[in-house]
């Protein structure tokens, strides 16, 4: 029942040489109430929405999702309905699925992980004080299935080896060779 305390018992045996670790999480409901965020966005001159991943999702030794977590896609779609002057600042170490809302927002800045002065840097870019040159250091695909890495992240595979058979056709060259149009190309 909602609101009642839950008792959870976790037992496991670590049989590898790597440190033991247990991760717990939760899932957001699809009926999240965005009314307060929408109310504030509706009366703003401009909305800068910082979306992305955090250290619990994107870290060394783990695969991270291509989709934005925690209902961020839904929130972006709701905010742009009430204020079309919406800038989405993405904080992630690579590409993110933007196809659910990219055609509705006027601007996206892929800020990567900018560090402690990232807020100032983003403000300087958005105000026009600094020109970021609009160059991406990687290609952002439209779909995860378009990524050259996609086939290597199947947890059901028994063999966990990656064979680099693409030769020089990595990154943007691979997209060109296969005729895949990315969402945002390298450079």
Regions inferred by a protein language model and the residue ranges of each:
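C-terminal non-catalytic regions of proteins with extracellular/luminal or membrane-system context
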Residues: 1-187
